[in-house]
Amino acid sequence: MSKYMDYTSPEAQFFFDVNKNPLFKKDNQNLINILGVNQLNTLDNSSLLDIYLSKHNFVEPHYHQNAAELVYCISGGAVVSMLNPYTKEVLNFRISPGQVANVPQGWWHYEEATKDQTHLLAIFNASTPEVILGSDILKFTPSSVMAYNYCMDESEWIKTTEKVKPSTYIGPGCLEPERHLSQRQSHFTYSPYHYQYQPNPCYYRQCIPKTF
């Protein structure tokens, strides 16, 4: 929905330096800057994330409950993965400079850099994108609820998730010895996998939104 904007007002903003508005910084090679209506008030249902990643770093699994996301590769390379809730299929798209992958609103997705110095631009059809992060789901859902619903040992679940950092944004969130990084091979194979499923998937709207 378009908003009213008085373009004659001295408060109307037409320029902003996205480099000066970090959302998250893991290190100098892995960081996210943000532009939304809170930074540039003449934006009309558009916003973006300026994403820098080194090889094998991820934008962690997450979804945007209020916007679709168009991921454009500026440099380097990445795999954009998303779960299609209708087919229960994980779709993987390798993108290189000049290529895009589109993530529909509300779809669970993540990105992995396949090269160092990867630069991605994530464009949203919302003035400020909202996000639900996988790390927050893992960390803040009561362990008793997870254990009971999924028939797990609660103590094992607690142990497994104890190192999960809330709002990880860029993973892995654990520290790796520097000497291992250059030798590390990806542990992930990007071919779609399938589940047997029932039609008419359920959608849950009772969530706590995070606004960037």
Predicted regions and their residues:
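Conserved short histidine dyad/triad with adjacent acidic residue
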Residues: 49-66, 94-97
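Glycine- and acidic-residue-biased ligand/ion/polar-headgroup-sensing regions
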Residues: 66-84
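Ligand-binding loop in jelly-roll beta-barrel domains
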Residues: 94-96, 105-132
